[in-house]
Amino acid sequence: MQQQSPPEQLDLAGMVADLNSLLRLKTTVIGMKMFATVEEMTAIPKIRRPTAVHTTDQIVSMASRLGWTVGITADDLVGAQCRAVIGLAPQDEKFLEGTNYVGVWHGTPEDARKRQEALDVVAYGKYLALAVSPLSSGRLDPPDICLVYATPGQMIILINGLQYTGYKKFEWGVVGETACADSWGRALKTGEPSLSLPCFAERRYGGVPDEEMLIALSPAHLAKAITGMKQLAKNGLRYPIAPYGIQADVRAGMGASYAKK
């Protein structure tokens, strides 16, 4: 029987350099990795451990805004919501009730429960720890997922890159509050690229700017997007997208791409 070749080793630092060249990103691209034991997490080089209680949003932003490598367990997080999304607490009946959100984010217990049931979460019982780190550091090699914060204009070019070959229509949802379930929760659960509009908590506690969206995707999907974006750039479809002029004759601009078609 023919032996299968090992998966291709990705140049994570090179991928980040390509991303920054293609999209001019403001925010550090990071990796996220789950661990079955705390010891595996603490063995990561130069890992920091929190000395206070945080939201997962804050931990993620310590990597994406400050460039830190940070590891956590359930005890480092503020409550069941943060823990449950990443599989560090059970998604039990108490979690599904969402009592804390009634009269805050939702008008009735029924609404709160529907939201809780709609969340994409990592199954409980497999992992005990999580770490985040700048992707270019290579400390999480490989990470389970990569997190890319980008403006809408940058994000659509990245998505176009993913769709350049092997086209797939992406259908994403918006749970509202706890939007981290739309990004890293869904990507960790399904392995699929997952786009989100960062929620109130991510912006208040994680410091995500108004103009940024978030996509979580595997290193392989990110590499595919980069390959696609490079080809798009050769075709004249690149970031920044230069405004053509709302009153200009569009034929010259369209002709650059489609005249020979």
Regions found by a protein language model. Give the residues of each.
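Acidic, serine/proline-rich low-complexity intrinsically disordered regions
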Residues: S5-K261
